[in-house]
Amino acid sequence: MTANVAARERPRRRGPAVWGVIGLLAQVAFAAGWMIAETWQGPRYSPLTDTISDLQAATAPHAWFPIACFAAGGLGTFGFAVFGLRPAWRGAVRIAPWAIGLSGLALGNSFPQIPCQLSASGCTATGQLLSAGGLTDAILSGAALWLLAITPLQLARLLIPLPQWRALARPLRVAGVVALAGYGLLALALLTGVWAGLVERALVAVCQLWLAVLAVNLIRTSGAGDG
């Protein structure tokens, strides 16, 4: 009887770990999408000044690669947050898993495509923004990055009652402060046209880092009695 119960419980305990691994792989996939795709852009494209979104523009070389990576990263992040973190937090944190998951889907979406890269001759920021792809990307990425900037601060407070998660309160608080500062700097960089690509990449890296920390902790605490 005891052996049968243990056999039934084993898959349940593995479930959170599986979603934690998926969450980690999702961040790797998303990072690969922009870090690798940068290597084959033309000489006019610069990671310092051009955004990640331009890598998936209709005129970008091999745009299918970042599009596929971003889609995989977005879907993986959604599954990790909704099917991994939400059950692990057992109702103590209700909104944040959905905010994380939907942000992942928003950042993973590449359609409709941006019509051209700003580094290409004849492409302008106004032309990008007035297109369906450019406007969609601006709205979705802006909202998603904002959610990923403020969510760590909320989690830093809400996770304290959970013994297996309270140790992350301080790192999440730091990540939230840095991400919010990065979001403000990104808005300024986009307005002035100075180092927008660099600031965006730094902000995205911070967001991916704290998501990876959550994924590692989910794996580490899988099967723990207090989640």
Where are these regions (language model features)?
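Short, charged juxtamembrane terminal tails flanking transmembrane helices
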Residues: T2-R8, I219-G227
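Hydrophobic, aromatic-enriched alpha-helical segments typical of multi-pass transmembrane helices
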Residues: P11-T221
